[in-house]
């Protein structure tokens, strides 16, 4: 997160074209969650996705370019801070809407089950997500379908 914070100091000209939601102090959780995931495993994140993206193998240079809205960013500057994605490393989606990463991860886990592979789909979300119906619906569906996946709050 030091890369990001050096561009957002109060009173200085802002270099980023988009809101940046940091997760300072939470990087170790992302690393721990992603350590044993493979490139074929997929993560679905929130608006605080920087650590998840990097822990899954995302490129630092492409992340910084994305934060600045530049070509060469992980989405060629179109996604910004809250939408870091790189399918080649399994960082499939970063969704800023509360709880929205959860059903995507469950759908991905269902696709893996139907394809009979051993991939894992992993959703990161905040505690407020558990107040949303989609959290409970997704958890119920995943249990009934016996899907392989993980959730990290």
Where are these regions (language model features)?
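A short, conserved beta-to-alpha structural element at the edge of catalytic cores
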Residues: 145-153
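Cofactor-binding active-site loop characterized by glycine-rich and histidine/acidic residues
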Residues: 2-5, 9-145
């Amino acid at each position: 997160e030091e890369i990001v914070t050096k561009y957002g100091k109060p009173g200085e000209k802002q270099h980023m074209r988009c809101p940046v939601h940091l997760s300072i102090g939470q990087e170790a959780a992302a690393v721990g969650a992603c350590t044993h995931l493979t490139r074929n495993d997929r993560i679905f994140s929130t608006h605080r996705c920087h650590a998840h993206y990097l822990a899954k193998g995302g490129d630092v240079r492409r992340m910084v370019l994305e934060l600045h809205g530049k070509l060469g960013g992980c989405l060629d500057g179109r996604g910004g801070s809250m939408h870091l994605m790189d399918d080649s490393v399994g960082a499939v989606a970063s969704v800023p809407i509360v709880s929205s990463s959860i059903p995507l991860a469950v759908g991905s886990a269902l696709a893996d089950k139907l394809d009979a592979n051993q991939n894992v789909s992993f959703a990161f979300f905040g505690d407020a997500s558990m107040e949303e119906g989609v959290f409970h619906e997704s958890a119920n569906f995943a249990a009934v379908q016996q899907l392989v996946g993980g959730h990290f709050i």
